[in-house]
Amino acid sequence: MPRSRTNGNFIDKTFSIVADILLRVIPTTSGEKEAFTYYRDGMSAQSEGNYAEALQNYYEAMRLEIDPYDRSYILYNIGLIHTSNGEHTKALEYYFRALERNPFLPQAFNNMAVICHYRGEQAIQQGDSEIAEAWFDQAAEYWKQAIALTPGNYIEAHNWLKITRRFE
């Protein structure tokens, strides 16, 4: 039985019911339906902190999903898991792959910026201001892209860009 059918969370159950209805109404292939089921189960496991199970579901969804736009969200969620696990290099790779398929994911740009900013802070703690500035400059570029896609969002990043004179 798919995970989404056994989940006790009200929101997840509601999402599952709506998704099942949409899958019946919207013309989709069996492969697309199966890919979505794995994606949905991955989101459910991820929301509960079951990252290994979520990754298994996402990898299976990636194997089945052919639409680049849908694949971008799978890749983005894999990036989120790697970020949560502190695997920043892997996370950056998955965010980048998501953006290759869908360049309109401001949240991926934001997460990449946060990782770069964090690495800049680490470099400062290690006494390497030159490396820190390079990381901060990269964070600024990613934040500018996120802000350009969704003006009015990422207020803290926007303020940081102004304060550090990185906003043009």
Swiss-Prot record:
Provide GO CC annotations from the record: chloroplast thylakoid membrane
HAMAP family named in the record: Ycf3
Q: Which family does it belong to?
A: Belongs to the Ycf3 family.
Q: What is this protein called?
A: Photosystem I assembly protein Ycf3
Check the record and name the Gene3D superfamilies matching this protein.
Tetratricopeptide repeat domain
- Its main localization is plastid
Start-end of each TPR repeat: 35-68, 72-105, 120-153
UniProt xrefs under InterPro entries: PSI_Ycf3_assembly, TPR-like_helical_dom_sf, TPR_rpt, Ycf3/AcsC/BcsC/TPR_MFPF
Cite the SMART domains for this sequence.
Answer: TPR
According to its UniProt entry, one GO biological process term is: photosystem I assembly
The organism's lineage is: Eukaryota, Viridiplantae, Streptophyta, Embryophyta, Tracheophyta
UniProt keywords, alphabetically: Chloroplast, Membrane, Photosynthesis, Plastid, Repeat, Thylakoid, TPR repeat
Q: How does it sit in the membrane?
A: Peripheral membrane protein
Where is this chain's protein located in or outside the cell? Plastid, Chloroplast thylakoid membrane
Q: What role does it play?
A: Essential for the assembly of the photosystem I (PSI) complex. May act as a chaperone-like factor to guide the assembly of the PSI subunits.
